[in-house]
Curated annotation (Swiss-Prot):
Gene Ontology terms: cellular component: ribonucleoprotein complex; ribosome
Organism: Rickettsia canadensis (strain McKiel)
SUPFAM superfamilies for this protein: L28p-like (SSF143800)
Keywords, alphabetical: Ribonucleoprotein, Ribosomal protein
Record keyword Ubl conjugation present: no
Descriptive protein name: Large ribosomal subunit protein bL28
Entry's family note: Belongs to the bacterial ribosomal protein bL28 family.
GO biological process: translation
Superkingdom as given in the UniProt entry: Bacteria
Any Pfam family matching the protein: Ribosomal_L28
The encoding gene: rpmB
PANTHER family in the cross-refs: 39S RIBOSOMAL PROTEIN L28, MITOCHONDRIAL, LARGE RIBOSOMAL SUBUNIT PROTEIN BL28M
Amino acid sequence: MSRKCDLTGVGVLYGNNVSHSQRKTRRRFEPNLRSVKFKSDITSGAYRLLVNARCISSVEKAGGFDAYILKADDNVLSSAARAIKKKIIQTKTAKSL
């Protein structure tokens, strides 16, 4: 399982631990990932995604899961999130007809 957010694409970063004597040792900065179930109002379904903690508040700020994922760029979304976005768009166009 990759350590990457499904909605924002945030992944592992690499850097250094620096001691008081300025010795540098390599380390990994891992994202604060959480498994969260988002409810879609358009498709009336619930989707479980692996997202970082900051993304949860971004989804709330955007006005909900549907608004956030429709606004998100396809390049940063995971394949599962892209499939959810496609399903939301299809359902939305079917309801508008």
